[in-house]
């Protein structure tokens, strides 16, 4: 079974834990309880392949920013989560993206831009801006609502597909070992 190490990043209060718990337990967490760091595992079937998702739900609070480099090193793919009703959380996505690219020392890191809280009527980040930003980054974007479960599976599954593409690109770039044969 293939394992995928997914990391959920974003500002505090954007719904990272709510999205993760909705995926894992099919349950919406109403109250806000700031996360320091939680890890979840779930077996799912994506495109006919059984996968084990190892999901790290991270702290959004600034006081835990020192921990970020460590989990960014170990993660294979990242959900960049912001709240559609909070423009500042969208602006801060660029900082998370840059930090991931710096820590990974690569421009080619699987990521998905996730606009959460789409069930709320007070959207301050319009869909076109999100779409254009994602296109500029060269990554997919998914609108979600942890409350209604809209787009939750799609966000995580899209990230797994991005990791698969990344693995294929990098496996194809590895030089093939030549077998040596001696005839005596």
Curated annotation (Swiss-Prot):
Classification via CDD domains: H_N_K_Ras_like (cd04138)
Cysteine methyl ester: modified positions: 181
Keyword annotations: Cell membrane, GTP-binding, Hydrolase, Lipoprotein, Membrane, Methylation, Nucleotide-binding, Prenylation
GO MF term list: GDP binding; GTP binding; GTPase activity; phospholipase binding; protein serine/threonine kinase binding
Residue span of motif Effector region: 32-40
Source superkingdom: Eukaryota
Lipidation (S-farnesyl cysteine): 181
One GO CC term on file: cell cortex
NCBIfam families in alphabetical order: small_GTP
Protein's UniProt name: Ras protein let-60
Source organism of the structure: Caenorhabditis elegans
Gene field: let-60
